Amino acid sequence: MNLSNSIGTSPHVLIMAGGSGSRLWPVSRTNKPKQFYDLLGTGQTMLQHTFDRALALTGSPSRIRVITQTQWGDLVREQLPELAEEHLLLEPIRKQSATATYYGLLSLETETDQDAVVILPCDHFVLDRERFDESIELALRAAVQTKALVIMGVKPTRPEPNYGYVQYVDNPAAGSEEARFHVKTFTDQPSQELANTFIRSGDFAWYTGIKVGGKEAFLDLYRRWMPDLVEVFAEFEAIKDPLLRKSLIDKIYPRCESVSFREGILDKAGTLLLQLGDYGWGDLTYWAEIYREHEKDYFGNAVNGSQVALFDSHNNMIHITGQRIALIDGLENYIVADSPEGILVCPRHKEGELRQRLAVLRRQQTDKNGGDKPPRLT
């Protein structure tokens, strides 16, 4: 679906691929985080799915940029061979999404500063691509017409405490479908009780992290709310040669503030529009989310692995990497996941305690290594 017919020119897309995904231990780790895995057994990684969505919006890989950390550059090259080297933007160190987004915006080769930009996180899934494209098109139209930033929200199907929420009010100036709401508040990962309240109130949506707007609209928000970051990048912006820019970015990044786009921009911005959609969206942050969305066998087992044999086992989340053979007998409501460096066997209802358990494991590993911090548990 090329959107050039509806907004004048195809949008540019920034794919944010710099997160570490540490909650999906032991599969998602520092050396290979979750966006580089096929977590739902579809035959494509999360990054590849996101690139396909971006390509459907732009019509050409030349209008797509992927932003990731330097250490994962080879993974992106391997999984996206159609991405030109100059369109792979590498962060020397992690500085969160506000800096990464600004870096990406300045790297776009736009015809004008009014060109539309779509920012896509790469660790999400979308089940209904047609409805997703339609929702993006509506958001792009609103962004072009109003010169405002439009964020994408999804109608919640349950009180999910692991997601971000956006509260909204009617936007009387909007048409029947195009960005019909103004953004009122953001809340990140509320308590279960508060999530229940949000669902009952009826004026909250899940915040997808997808943002749509003209390039100049994004840059204006940075000039107003993050002027120090703009100043740090002034020399980078003045240089047009891609090779010189890549050498300069190593000097720039240590001076940048580490803050999310929501905290640095969205929480401060006055006028934000919400495009509310329903296209089977989810954020694969926890094993529980992967289990919920994964195809299951007759006994409720979600299995990712080519050589897994299950006997008398029900409602398990099984993720076995590579060609390893696994035989599981008599297990119910468990998570079993492996990687070359670790194995997780955990009741599904105890996944929320995993981070504390890992902290204990790290301390034990440190003690065994004579006080040296173990490198393989992050």
Task: Show which residues each predicted segment covers.
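Residue-level signal for inorganic ion chemistry
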Residues: 47, 104, 123, 166, ...
